[in-house]
């Protein structure tokens, strides 16, 4: 633990270099990669962020990363672990360098760095815990959707996305836009004001359909799990502005990927209508107050990017899909 602070900072520097390379590569291949491929690349990079917390032995006679990973590979045949074991030498070299430099730094500096880092973690954990409590309170105050017409529309949307599970749908007075929330027991929540506007005829069933399809695509692609991972990364990397930018970009890519998934279900003549739904409800679907929810909401800048994505969207060809998979 004495040299952990320096090793962690060293790993952050290396991670930033890799992250800069990834962002540059994605910008270079932006036209070759679909929104979903861009998002998937970012998710894969999240695995790199656990490297500083993996156990590494500093003593030559102790078990090194390569030994641990090789043993793990021989036990469960995990391909990814085998790949990492091949880089064990480089990882140990980084560890040895961190140990040699950290021993030259006074102990109180290590202690001070860990102290401030821990304070930040405590604050971020508190904010994350508060978000979990908000989601729980949202569920406690919500009621099962009673509108028969909307329930029938929801069943149609489930069939459109070929969902194998019927996700419960609730109504609530504490939201401005529909959201998907709940890690173990996901649910979709519709704002009561949208239901009232639908009954009054000021919102069409088409608008509600697009919103429901958007939430169901979040569920289908396990975006809630990714959302929890993103918030966990925020906790431990609260001090790194490049990581914050990267996580913000993942959220933007998630919405672009979700929009593209919805558009793939629609006819080409419906693309404009879907974009109009985002524009017409831009004020209503402001940012959700709950960070752990998935919704169609976003700030004006994000909505502008999504509208441009919708305007330029076209169904990917077979060659484009193969090219994207090969790049990823």
Show the residue positions of the predicted features.
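Hydrophobic membrane-embedded segments
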Residues: 1-125, 140, 156-166
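Cytosolic-facing loops and C-terminal tails of multi-pass membrane proteins
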Residues: 2-5, 31, 92-130, 268, ...
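Transmembrane alpha-helix boundary/anchor motif
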Residues: 20-24, 123-133, 237-241, 253, ...
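Transmembrane-cytosolic junction motif
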Residues: 32, 36, 126-145, 244-250
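Central hydrophobic cores of alpha-helical transmembrane segments
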Residues: 40-45, 231, 276, 326-328
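Extended, hydrophilic extramembrane loops/domains of integral membrane proteins
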Residues: 83-84, 282-292
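Polar-ligand-bearing catalytic/cofactor-coordination segments
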Residues: 138-222, 248-273, 297-315
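Post-HEXXH active-site segment of zinc metalloproteases
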Residues: 221-252, 271-281
């Amino acid at each position: 633990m004495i040299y952990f602070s320096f090793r962690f900072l060293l790993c952050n520097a290396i991670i930033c270099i890799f992250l800069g390379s990834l962002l540059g590569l994605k910008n270079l291949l932006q036209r070759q990669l679909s929104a979903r491929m861009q998002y998937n690349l970012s998710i894969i990079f999240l695995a790199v962020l656990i490297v500083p917390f993996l156990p590494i032995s500093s003593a030559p006679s102790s078990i090194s990363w390569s030994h641990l990973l090789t043993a793990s590979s021989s036990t469960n045949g995990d391909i990814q672990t085998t790949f990492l074991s091949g880089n064990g030498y480089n990882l140990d070299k980084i560890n040895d360098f961190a140990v040699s430099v950290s021993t030259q730094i006074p102990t109180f500096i290590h202690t001070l760095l860990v102290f401030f880092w821990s304070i930040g973690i405590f604050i971020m954990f508190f904010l994350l815990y508060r978000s979990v409590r908000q989601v729980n309170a949202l569920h406690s105050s919500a009621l099962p959707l009673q509108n028969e017409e909307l329930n029938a529309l929801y069943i149609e949307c489930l069939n459109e996305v070929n969902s194998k599970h019927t996700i419960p749908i609730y109504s609530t007075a504490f939201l401005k836009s529909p959201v998907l929330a709940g890690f173990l027991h996901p649910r979709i929540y519709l704002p009561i004001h949208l239901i009232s506007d639908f009954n009054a005829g000021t919102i069409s069933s088409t608008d509600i359909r697009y919103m429901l399809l958007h939430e169901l695509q979040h569920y289908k692609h396990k975006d809630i799990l990714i959302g929890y991972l993103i918030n966990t990364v925020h906790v431990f990397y609260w001090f790194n502005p490049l990581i914050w930018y990267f996580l913000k970009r993942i959220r933007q890519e998630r919405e672009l990927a979700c929009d593209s998934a919805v558009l793939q279900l629609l006819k080409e003549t419906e693309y404009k209508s879907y974009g109009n739904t985002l524009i017409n409800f831009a004020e209503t679907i402001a940012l959700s107050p709950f960070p752990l929810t998935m919704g169609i909401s976003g700030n004006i800048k994000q909505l502008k990017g999504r509208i441009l994505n919708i305007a330029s969207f076209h169904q990917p060809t077979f060659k484009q899909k193969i090219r994207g998979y090969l790049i990823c």
